[in-house]
Amino acid sequence: MNGGMSSTFSTEAGGPGAWIAPLAAGLPELGELDLGQLHRFDAALRDLRVRFPIDAGVQPALRSERLLRIRHELAASGHLAAAVATCDGGCGRPGLVQTMMQFICGYHDIDLRDATGLGHGRLIASYASAAVRDQWLPRLLGGALAGIAITEAHGGSQVHATTTAAVPRRDGSWAVSGTKSSISRLDEAAVFCVFFKDPAGHLTAGVVDAGAAGLRRRPVTPAGLSGWAWGELHLDGVRLRQRDILARPGTGMDLVREHFAHYRPLVAATALGAAAAACDSVAAHLGTREKAGFITAPRDNALITLGRAYAQINAAMLAALTAQRLSEACDEGASLWGCAAKAHGVDVAYAAASELALLAGAPGFAADSQLAKARRDLNGLLYADGIHDSLYRAVGRTLTVTAGLRRPDARVPLPRIAQDQQSNFMPGTGPWARDQVTGQPPSNEITVPALIASTHAAIRRASSGITRSAT
C-alpha cells in the first residue's frame, strides 16, 4: 500500500518529490519502504552534489571524476543496488524504484544518469557465465561502470550491418577486431559489452575488460552529455574466450531487443526529470520576478507554456512507467513500448525545456546555465539509445504489420479485479471464460495471450536493429 506516501514525499517540499508523489499514487508496487528510499536517495544526491559539484561550468575531466565518485558513494550507502535483483546481489526492490530514481537523477543533472543501478552491466547480470558474473558483478555493485559498444560508422540503427568481427584462434578463443563509434563511458567504463559478428557471421555479444590488450580509444568532444568521455573504441585482435560470450553465439539481436526494452524507459525517465526541473526553475523565476515588482503577473502565454509542459511531462512519465512494467513482466509488447516511451519521452522533455527556456530570459541561454546544459543534454538523448525517428518508425511498422491480427470487434478484457468479481457471480463467463468441453476460449473472444502469440514474430521483425549506444 502507498496510501501514506504524502508523509514520505511531500508535494509541498518541491523538487522531484512534488512530481513523484502523485505518480506514485497509481503504482501499487511502490510501498512506504520504497518511497522512503526515494526520499533518502534524493537527499543523498543533493548532499553529494554539494560535495562534488558537477555543474555546467566544471571541466569535463573533473566532472567525469566526480561523477564516478558520486556513484561509488551511492554504492557505499546502499542506494546503487536498491532496485537490483537479490539474485544479482542487490536489495530486490521493484523495478519501478529504478525508474523513479532515474527521474530524480535527471532532475538534478542528466549526467547523473549512471549514478545508480547496473546500467548496461545488466547484460552481464542476466546473460553472462557464472565465472564472468562472479568477476564483474561485485565490482559493478561497488561502483564500477559498464559501457556498451554497438554503434559503428554506418549508424546505430543498423545493428545487422555490424562490421566488427571475430576470427577463431588456435586455442579455441576468438580475436575480435573493428571500430565502434559514439561510445559513451569511453574512459570511465571498467568493462564493455561489445556486439560483433561471430565466425559464423551471426550477431553475438561478449564481455571485454576495459584494460584488455588490443583496445584503443579516440575521444571526440560531444555537444551534450559530456559527463562521460565519448568517442571511438578500436578493437584490434581483442581476445574473447568462450566464457566471455553473453548468452550464446548468435543471440546478439535478441539481447539488444530485450536489454533496450528495459533500458529505454529509464532513459525517458531521466530526460523527463530534467524537464521537470526546468519547469520548476522557470516557475520559480517568474514568481521571483513578480514578487520583486519586475512584472505585475506572468503573461497568459507563459502560464499556458508551464501548464502544457506539466501535463506532457506527467503523461510521458506514465508511459515510461508502463513500459518499465511491461519489461519487468517480460511482456511481448515491452520492446514496442520501450521504443515509443523513449522516443516520446525525450521529445517531450526536449520540447518542454526549449520552450521554457524562452521564459527564463537571457540567463537561461548562458553557457554555464543549468537550463542551457539540460537542453544540450536532452538534444543528445534524442540520438542516444535509439534515435527518435528510427524508434517511431519501428513502432509504426509494428502497428501496420499487426493491424490485420487485431479484430475491430474484439472485446477489451476486463481489469483483473473486475474479472474476479464477475467470476464470483457468474461462473464460466467473462472474457477469460473457457468452453466446458474443449477448455478453449470462446470463438468470439480474443484473449491477450492469444494476441501476444500471434504478434510476437511481427514485433520482433519490426523492432530489429533499432538501437544506439551513445549513452
Predicted regions and their residues:
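N-terminal glycine-rich flavin-associated loop
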Residues: 112-131, 159, 170
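C-terminal helix-coil-helix/basic helical segment that borders enzyme active sites and/or dimer interfaces
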Residues: 53-61, 287-294, 313-344, 357-365
